[in-house]
Amino acid sequence: MIEHAEVLQRGDDSGNEMLVRFRLPSGLEIFGLPTKNFYGGHWDLGPTWNYAVLSDRPFLVDAGRFGQGKKLVAMLEKIGITAADLDFVLISHGHEDHDGGLAELVDATCLNVKAHAIYGRLIKTYPAKSPTADKKDFPAKCWHCPMPETFYTQNCLEYHNVLQGLKIDPIGNGANEIGPDIRTAHLPGHSPDCLAVRLGDEAIIVGDIILPDISPWPTRKSLFNEVAAVIDPPYTDAAAIFGLRCYIRSLKKLIKIASDAPGLLVLPAHRFYYHGRWNPVDLENRAKELLAHHIARCGAIIDILKNGAKTAEEIAAAHFEKDLLEGYGSIMAANEIVSHCELLIESGDVVAVNGNAYAATGSMQFETDIQEEI
């Protein structure tokens, strides 16, 4: 059981349908409201944990995936919270399982929306700036989606369309903060707009930046080139908001936060309750585990390349378990490999060859670079 947690309604073994109250020593109450995802199999995330924070300015963090907005309103009402009780909804980052229900939620509640400034730019369409013709009707945040056209046309177009009219109040980087004891931290890498919400020295809502049980998916640094036209200026440095190295810096910032405020209750967006048990997160230890995970993956990639140059898909096939490569899993795995190869290229341990393949150089500088990254 998680300290300070009171289960108000039990759900299934993944946490779906649960209602949980966290009452902190200061008296601050936070409600965990997990909404369903359609993902399954070996890439299953479990539900998205949205949180209602009953501070001086009560607010909601995240809105679940597409179609879950009204469900989230019903969950709030079940614990005695109405739209009139909330000041705004804050989006931790612009992935569909976090903002998919946003438009429906806003339509039902008229809540103001806060998110990082990058989010506000990426949810808009820019037909003249789209990198490919098939993406001109999709917002900029969809331009870098690795899924095939058949997937995003069938599953994503309506979701993207309903976000277009939303007004986003930018928050983060010290701008428009919630209060003296409630601050956001911009921690990109998994997504360029990732925010964590620190609730004094008692708790931190981390979205997908750090998760129990599974490792968050790092972006590729090269994705910056596809959206630079709509976020530059002021975001001119790809390494500041995209890529594995960026994600590693965010993990180290979380380690610093944990050092400054030991004992923080960590409220993640997935796998908080899974397989019928709680998965508590020690912020410092989990961040260090994830750093070690990425160091090990870089080493594994170099070992695979000792037998000759390979594409990202070939490296993924050699590195990941076969069942993780089924369906769209192969695309996700290849993206993961590319993000690591980008870092290995910067460290001088790997070079790009033949357009789409990678070869080892014989050096092993990456671990030193990761450990020294600030």
Features from the language model and the residues they span:
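Metallo-beta-lactamase
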Residues: 67, 181-288, 292, 298
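Aromatic/hydrophobic pocket-lining residues that form the small-molecule binding cavity
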Residues: 99, 247, 251, 337
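Residues at alpha-helix caps and immediate loop-helix transition turns in enzyme cores, especially N-
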Residues: 45, 71-72, 101, 282-286
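Active-site HxH/HxHxD metal-binding segment of metal-dependent hydrolases
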Residues: 65-70, 77-178, 210-212
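Conserved beta-strand hairpin/beta-sheet module of binuclear metal-dependent hydrolase folds
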Residues: 17-83, 196-213
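Short Pro/Gly-enriched beta-strand edge/turn motifs at strand-loop
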Residues: 2, 27-38, 153-156, 177-182
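Divalent metal-coordination and catalytic microenvironments
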Residues: 53, 62, 72, 93, ...
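C-terminal regulatory/interaction regions
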Residues: 2-7, 12-15, 299-374
